A protein has these predicted regions:
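Surface-exposed acidic/polar loop and edge beta-strand patches at domain peripheries
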Residues: 1-111
Length: 111
């Protein structure tokens, strides 16, 4: 899996995203010369299962207890990826997908 980045910027900020998890990787404040957000250090670290740092959470955000839920009287079972629970979309949530960039404009990146 290849980690690709995209950058948009204005006179104040430079924003870098990654295709893995449609992740927000860097929000760099130009005059203060500092990255304003937490990331995993290297974009290559996003290849491996990690915390959802900057990544798109989904299909839902948060934990589903015991990896199961009901709709009406029907019980559904999910894969467990956080002890006995399902976290942030399960084993292959949105944070693990390789997203295709469909538009890069001066002020937006769309995956």
């Amino acid at each position: 899996m290849k980690v690709l980045s995209s950058i948009i910027e204005n006179k104040f900020l430079k924003i870098k995203t990654l295709n893995i998890g449609a992740s927000l990787f860097e929000v760099y404040h130009k005059s203060k010369k500092i990255n304003l957000i937490l990331n995993l250090g290297s974009k290559e670290n996003y290849k491996f299962k990690n915390f959802c740092v900057g990544s798109t959470c989904g299909r839902y955000a948060g934990r589903i207890g015991n990896a199961e839920f009901f709709i009406g009287k029907k019980k559904f079972f999910l894969n467990k990826n956080d002890g006995d629970n399902t976290l942030h979309g399960g084993k292959i949530g949105f944070d693990r997908l390789v997203w295709k960039k469909i538009n890069l404009a001066k002020n937006k990146i769309i995956y």
